[in-house]
Amino acid sequence: MEEAIAELEGGYKAIGCASGMAAVHTLIAGMVKSGDHIVCSESVYGATSVLLSTIMPEFGVETTFVDSSEIEQVKNAIKPNTRMIYIETPGNPTLAITDLAAVEKIAKEKGIYFAIDNTFMSPILQKPFEFGADFIIHSMTKYLNGHADVVAGIIVVKTPEHYAILRKMSNHFGGVIDPFNSFLVHRGLKTLSLRVLRQQENAQKIAEFLENHPKIDNIQFPGLPSHPQYELAKRQQKGSGSMISIELKGGYEAGTKLMDNVKLFQLA
């Protein structure tokens, strides 16, 4: 399973973890030390935000959250002790797109690590190593497994040195994936391309329908020309993915009413 995902991402090797957050924590704990600083997308998975904003400061690691779709914010947040730039693109849940080539240039100039959470795209639609990433994170619970019967994560690395550090960290932290979940994820990989492309096709039709719906105030979907980074998404991604972010007219009350009445969707 690890070999298959490393090959899909074009990496050296991969480290399977017990969850997406086990992967994030292993990466941070392995590559960042007390006194270091991280620059992170503000539109990032909620548990990643909590880890970096409330838990890692207790271990001497500070994080600055920025709108990474505005590259100047990334550049201006760099400090002398910045050790890593951590990007999730498209953003979760705003679907804002970060210019990965521009971030890679900053990271290279400053000599700092560049990590990308590629969960929303999968290796089918985005190849972070082609844009200079040092590390790729996935929550395999989502697209990679694809059958809603596994909780798992993975880190993909480019170098033997980083692999040795993170494999040791994973083994001794204990957040390793078990053999049966590895088997299930490997099963899911066999249909990954078919699933991702069909989901994307369906999402495009749904987004086009919702864009002109009278009860929708705003919609963010990289496959719509109205998306602020539509052209960047076309250059950087091999597709728009299948995540859609909407804002309803009527705000929180309207959103609550909608979620209380949906039949197919549930809290992920």
Question: Can you annotate each of these PLM segments?
Answer:
Residues 9, 18-21, 42, 223, ...:
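Short glycine-rich, polar/acidic loop-and-turn segments at beta strand-coil junctions
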Residues 14-215:
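Conserved PLP-enzyme active-site core in the AAT-like
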Residues 5, 166, 210, 258-259:
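A generic structural signal for nonpolar/aromatic side chains embedded in well-ordered alpha-helices
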